[in-house]
């Protein structure tokens, strides 16, 4: 993955394996080992983290807080159907909001699947209040994606993000090396909507890192 990112001219690569709950994913020992992995390879910066599962309507996460805090450079939470029972719009929205409010979480992954209906205004408002990033997922927009209605759902979410000045992060969801750095669908969507570049935090390495750092400082103050 790092070599592919370097070959494509990227300056930073985030590697976020699925946490426990997804069949066949990494166990706890893998994430503990992240502390010793180099943060620079092939001339690019590396950030290691996890896409942690939201496992119930109360926003419970599938990874212990001590592991999240001590081992992860990037802390993402998302809903995945193998480990989540779909509820009502209110229940699904609450699951996301509780994860957004969790000070351990930096990013909410692909909140764009019509199979998990949510209230987008509530989600965007919570993201703004808690300084949590919402992901625009390139894989969701692909015609082969198992997620349903992502294009329309992301249009709704992005319009609200623009109106409320809520920043987003673009993600490739690359599960193999050739997909690293591929944002083709995201680029089309953002261009069609004329979405402000200044609200896309990974437009530069410095902006992304600063956004995550600022998010954690604000949330830390809120906890103290």
Language model regions located:
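Alpha-helical scaffold segments that flank or form the walls of functional sites
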Residues: 1-13, 33-40
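Histidine/acidic-residue-rich catalytic or RNA/ligand-binding cores of hydrolases
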Residues: 24-28, 117-124, 144-160, 177-191, ...
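Extended substrate/RNA-proximal surfaces in nucleic-acid metabolism proteins
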Residues: 19, 24-136, 191-201, 207-224
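His/Asp/Glu-enriched short active-site or ligand-binding loop at hydrolase and phosphoryl-transfer sites
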Residues: 133-146
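Short acidic/histidine-rich active-site segments
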Residues: 18, 166-180
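Conserved short secondary-structure transition element at the edge of the structured enzyme core
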Residues: 154-172
